[in-house]
């Protein structure tokens, strides 16, 4: 009888610690999601601010624009942060 109570007591302790650890895991994941969404918003805002200034954005966009237009058999130009494909 004493052995059964002892093992039951150990099982209860293990179950309680598992529940506590699971709660910490959820808390950790929610904190991680919050931080990642904050970083995503900061990057998005920075990108929007960068692309709103054509003198800074065109060098960033131009390489993508050239590749994009080359696939269409055209020449890519960046004008006012917009990619324009000109026929060859």
UniProtKB/Swiss-Prot annotation:
It is found in: Secreted. Its main location: secreted. Expressed by the venom gland. Residues 55-88 form the BetaSPN-type CS-alpha/beta domain. GO terms for cellular component: extracellular region. One of its GO terms (molecular function) is potassium channel regulator activity. Keywords: Disulfide bond, Ion channel impairing toxin, Neurotoxin, Potassium channel impairing toxin, Secreted, Signal, Toxin. InterPro entries: Long_scorpion_toxin_alpha/beta (IPR029237). Disulfide bonds join 58-78, 65-83, 69-85. Residues 1-22 form the signal peptide. Belongs to the long chain scorpion toxin family. Class 2 subfamily. The RNA coding for this protein is silently edited. This is Potassium channel toxin MeuTXKbeta3-meucin-24. It comes from Mesobuthus eupeus.
């Amino acid at each position: 009888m004493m052995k059964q109570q002892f093992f039951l007591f150990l099982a209860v302790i293990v179950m309680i610690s598992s529940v506590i650890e699971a709660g910490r895991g959820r808390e950790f994941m929610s904190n991680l999601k919050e931080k990642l969404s904050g970083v995503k918003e900061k990057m998005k805002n920075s990108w929007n601010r960068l692309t709103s200034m054509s003198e800074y954005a065109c060098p960033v966009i131009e390489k993508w624009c050239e590749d994009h237009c080359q696939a269409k058999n055209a020449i890519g130009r960046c004008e006012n942060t917009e990619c324009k494909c000109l026929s060859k």
